[in-house]
């Protein structure tokens, strides 16, 4: 694992917020310009980047410093990560990736799904009550004839 000092990061990498809300971990598979409030990690070959992403997400970072909070590279190194073999890293990432995707999709998709179900409920509720009202009117018409 290396600390990125380049202005533009082209490789797949992991960023961790180091100021304000510290410890927010992002996987980046696109080129970006890192802000000074990020610690950027471009893994060496012995690391599976998705394993590193999940391992970093599992750390409970402690706020240190001013009221804003900060995390320095030196402080970050104190947390340490147990790194299994590359094969085991890939196995762990293969298990955690689908779970992470499921929960991420759930958090993003659930509000939209709830809204669609509300619209569906409104539609069928209106349809059924209108149908009941029409049936009632037909019965009343038939009884008056």
UniProtKB/Swiss-Prot annotation:
Q: This protein's superkingdom?
A: Bacteria
Q: Which GO terms describe its biological process?
A: DNA restriction-modification system
The keyword DNA-binding is assigned to this record: yes
Q: Which UniProt keywords apply?
A: DNA-binding, Restriction system
Q: Which family does it belong to?
A: Belongs to the type-I restriction system S methylase family.
Q: What does this protein do?
A: The C-terminal section of a specificity (S) subunit of a type I methyltransferase (MTase); this subunit dictates DNA sequence specificity. The single R subunit has multiple frameshifts and is probably not expressed.
The protein's name in its UniProt record: Putative type I specificity subunit S.MpnORF289P C-terminus
Specify the species. Mycoplasma pneumoniae (strain ATCC 29342 / M129 / Subtype 1)
